[in-house]
Structures are given as structure tokens and as C-alpha cells.
Amino acid sequence: MARQYPLNKFRNIGIMAHIDAGKTTSTERILFYTGKTHKIGETHEGAATMDWMVQEQERGITITSAATTCFWKDHQINIIDTPGHVDFTVEVERSLRVLDSAITILDAKGGVEPQTETVWRQADKYQVPRMIFVNKMDILGADFYMSVQTVRDRLRANAVPIQIPIGKEDDYAGHVDLIKMKAVIFDKELGVNYDEVEIPEDLKDKAEEYRSAMIEAIVETDEELMMKYLEGEEISEEEIHTALRKATIANEIVPVLCGTAYKNKGIQHLLDAVLAYLPSPLDIPSIKGVDEDGNEVERHASDDEPLGALAFKIATDPFVGKLAFVRIYSGVMHSGSYVLNSNKNKKERIGRLVKMHANHREEVEELYAGELGAVIGLKNTTTGDTLCDENAPVILESMEFPEPVISVAIEPKTKAAQEKMGIALAKLAEEDPTFKTYTDQETGQVIIAGMGELHLEIIVDRLQREFKVECNVGAPQVAYKETIKNAVKAEGKFVRQSGGRGQYGHCWIELIPHEGEYEFENAIVGGAIPREYIPAVDNGIQEAAQSGILGGYPVINFKVKCYDGSYHDVDSSEMAFKVAGSMAFKNGMAKATPVLLEPVMKVEIVVPEEYMGDVMGDVNSRRGRIEGMNPRGGAQVIAAFVPLSEMFGYATVLRSRTQGRGTYSMEFANYEEVPKSIAEKVVGENK
């Protein structure tokens, strides 16, 4: 089947927002208008089309980003619905990596909320052009102008309204289009129909003021228009469109629109703006990668280039097994063909290709450059792998994922389910790179680790529902680490001579505190240790560092210099030097003032003014450091750094202290030293 839509008629967009800002509802409405859904799903009823996992429908939050294809005015739009809960930021990172642009949805009552900032920062990292849709204009307390101000203050973004609302709360009727200078009034019932009329008298001055501000912001990004504007010439609608599109794609301007998805107002105009101002795959820089010799290469969005595709998500489907969601950057992927997974250097056969609608799928023969779809039948591909033409290998830049910060022990309720649980956990870990599972060497328990309590709750929930594994879960454990404070020199000597061949390994090392990755420096001169044994010393040290001397936690933030040693012509072996390296490390660590480190979280708590004192007192009692307080939309925002170990069950505490009105979000900040009294307790419990 030939390509249906040319590349310039493609839009790959993400929809991102704070939890509950109305993201899934907005996506639903887009699917409704573009003819993909016949009945609109309501999140309240647990029937939204995009939220297709059972847990999402129950909790009313979006967990897995479903990629959906829809059509509007001769354009193909691929939408990725991203989760808004902070425990799932990896899903957001992954989606942003493969999008060309995004719509940020704000709640008109709250404006920019904590998670909006997190997601916005991630979008900045990938330089994703954005538009803002101020949603829920019909609810009590909705304030469009305050919301726009929060974008400028908190996100430091150049937010430029291209619409302003007519009325608010129950009286919200539509908006003024500042480019056409017309009022758009929606039908009261379903909002599907609307009329373009003259601007109401009482809004004319405001519309003029905001139109002037919009034009000034646009001409600042275009010298020719600036000259025209300064000379007092009229700037045409066409010129505004062209300049605004250019400025949006260059991340110089963020256009702001308004509406209410739930009442169907403003979605058609949002779709028009997506086509008008957001980039097609041709408008964004070509993707860079490296070839097999390590040289940088570019892949352009064209069907004629060799295939270059990125697997950005792996999902397990109950009917077809493993689905790999891919973005085709260049070339064409054919079903039934063979491709190279360049990260693993293995050939893969493309089984079937499907384009996804939220939860039904359409089989296709080919996926073209610029498209998003899913592949069935890949054996070795995991998240972040590149699939390419074997005659033109390339590795597209891979994604970095944060390390898990919280872990729990888990065991099946029956012995029979042990193997089933192992298979299920392996499948879940394949889908989600921030979820790890391993067996504790000392206790033999299976441990699962992730990004937060909700993350692990949902994993356990999925084990029970999708894989029918009933399990018991232990109390959450913090991922402590150990490090050293002083530099020391230490000796490791392993000698065994008792009949037959002996063992002899001997090294001197210097352990040095060092922020950053582990480094090993070979400073041996004069062959005190033969070259072939040096890697064994390094391996011995790295293995010993997996389990520190305080509580058996991994040791981080140090580097090693191996500067002397001795060997025996006959008795020395790699094994002996590995043991010597391990002994030297343990001896050195004991003398280097070892300390315990704990993960500290950056916490943001939003509470009504009257609960401020109570909540701050509670944060202090949790060893929290309060960094600042800012008023926001009638509430106070407390920014603090709090050790993760003190945050377990915090959601319940905050709810009871604020009568359910407080919310919080947290993300990993860094590792910090644990106070001595607490460190002794932690180590005591672990021994």
C-alpha cells in the first residue's frame, strides 16, 4: 500500500499534563472529532478509549502511553498519551524522545502544577516545540489569565495567547480568535457546533490589547515583520500564521489556547492549531546516530533513505504477545522483512505491523518514515533499541533512565506460582526500564525495585491481574548506598601454599573519594604486577564494592589507583589477583571512614494556607529541609528535600492533615550522608 499522506501532512504529537488536568478526556475528544471513536468515553465512568489497562480505568489515571493514529483535514496525526503521575516519568521521557511536538494541558483553576514542571523540563531536554491548552474553563475558579501568568513565572516560557475566553465558569461560552479577530461561540449542548460572530462589545478592548501583545511577541522573532510593524504597516493574517509557525517550531513562542474538553468546547480549534503551528517530521532537525565505526551520521525523514527506527516502548498484549512500539525516522519498514537490531547486533524478523487506535489495531503492510506503529514478532528487541537496514547499520541515540529508589520483597502465595512469577516479572522488567527485579543473595528473597510506591503497587497489581500470580509484598525498603570520606592506601595479599600449585596475588591500592562514576587507574610501573593480571584486580574491587562493610550496601563515589604489588612466577593467577583486589578494597574501606548514604527526594507539597504550619512542622519532623514557599492560586507550595525513608505512606498522612486538600509530588534528587544515630539503626536492622 503506497503512502497515503505526504510527510508534510504528518504530525506526531504528545499530550502531557499534571495528573487530573484533563489529558485523557482531551485525547478522547480529539479521537471523537477525527472520527476514530463513535462514542465518547468518559474518564469518570472508567470508559476512556486511551486508558486501556484495567488499573487505569479503575484509578482514572493514564499509565501506559498508547500511540494512536487519527486524521484531521487531510493530515495524519499520531498521538501519544503520556502519564501525568510522577512515578511514571520514564514513560514521559520515552514518549518525548519520539515526538515532534507536544500539547501541554493546564487546569484553568490551578495553572502550572508540580508535575507540569517536571514534564516541561523533560520536554526542554529534547527541545520539543509546544502549545498550551488551558482546559476546564467551565469549572469553578477557572482563571485563564492567571494560568498564562503561571506559565511565564514557573516555566519561564514565552506564553502567547492566540485566543482569549468569552466568559468563565458556568458562563464560559467560547473564545475570541485573536488572529482573525472573530468570536467563536459554541453550541450549549454538545459544543460540537459553533458560530463565528463579531466580538462582544465588552471584550473588544481586551481583545485589542491581547492581539497587540501577540503581534509584538511574533514580530520580535522575525526581522522583516519587525520593520514592517515599526513602520506602522498592517500585518496580514497569512504573515502572522507563517511567523507564528516558525517561532513555535524554533521554541521561541508557546501559543496558548483555551476550552473545555469535557464540554466539547475548543477541541476543533486546537486540532486546527496543531496543523497550523506544530512541526511535521520535515520541520525538525534530522536524527543523529553513530555508524558501526563510531562516526556520527544523520538520518533524514524520507522513504528513500535506509531504514532507521527506534523501539520506544515494549508492551505485552494478552492476544499477540510482545508488541514493540516503533518510530520510523527514515526509510520504510515492511512486514515479513528482516532488519538489524544494531544495539544487540542481531537480526530480527518483522512479523506483523500494526497501527494502533487506543485499543484496537489495524494491520498494515508497511510503516513509512515519520510514522509510529507497533511490531509483532520481535524476539530480542528492548526499549531504546534501534532497528535498521543491515546494509546501513546505525545506532540512534539511546535513552537514559533513572535508577530505581525504592524496593520491596515479594513472594508468591503458593510454591507452584514461583516459576510463573519469575516469568511475569521478567516480562514487566522488559516493558519498563525503571523497574528492576533481582534475588537477594543473602536472604534468597525476590526483590522488585522502582520509582515510587505507586509504581510498585501497579506492578504488583498487574502481576495479579494479567499474570494471575497472587503474591505477598514486604514493607518498602530504601536503596541505601555506602561511600568513603577519606583517601587511604591499602594492601591486599592472598597467599596459599599447601601442597600442589599455590595461589599468590598481592597489590597495593589507593582508594580516593570521587563524585561520579567508578574509575580504575593502573599506575603500576616496572612490571610489579604483570599487565594481564591488572583487570583481575579491578574486577575483584568492583565485586567487593557491590557489598560495603557497613550494611552490605553497594559502594559508590570512589575511584581506585593501583600503584604497586608483587607476583610469583608459578603461583600467580587471575583468581589470586581478583581475591587480592577484593581484600585490598575491604581493608582500605575500613580505614577510609565509611559512611552510609540515603536517597533524598525533591518534594513539592501544595496545601491551602490554613494547613501550612501543620504540614511544615511535619516535614521538619521527617528530617526535611525546606527550600522555599510560594503562593500559587490560593494555595501555598512548599519545596523541600526529604529522605525517601521518611516519605513512606506520606500520601495518607498529608490527606488526613489537610482534609484531603493537599497534594504532593516527589522525584529523586541525590544521595546524602545519613546522620550517625540513624545510620547505626539502619545498619543494625540490616545485619
UniProtKB/Swiss-Prot annotation:
Principal location: cytoplasm
Entry's localization field: Cytoplasm
Classification via Gene3D superfamilies: 3.30.230.10, 3.30.70.240, Elongation Factor G (Translational Gtpase), domain 3, P-loop containing nucleotide triphosphate hydrolases, Translation factors
GO MF terms, alphabetically ordered: GTP binding; GTPase activity; translation elongation factor activity
Keywords (A to Z) from UniProt: Cytoplasm, Elongation factor, GTP-binding, Nucleotide-binding, Protein biosynthesis
Claim: Protein biosynthesis is one of the keywords in the record: yes
A GO term from the CC aspect: cytoplasm
SUPFAM superfamilies reported for this sequence: EF-G C-terminal domain-like (SSF54980), P-loop containing nucleoside triphosphate hydrolases (SSF52540), Ribosomal protein S5 domain 2-like (SSF54211), Translation proteins (SSF50447)
Family: Belongs to the TRAFAC class translation factor GTPase superfamily. Classic translation factor GTPase family. EF-G/EF-2 subfamily.
Name of this protein: Elongation factor G
Species this protein is from: Clostridium novyi (strain NT)
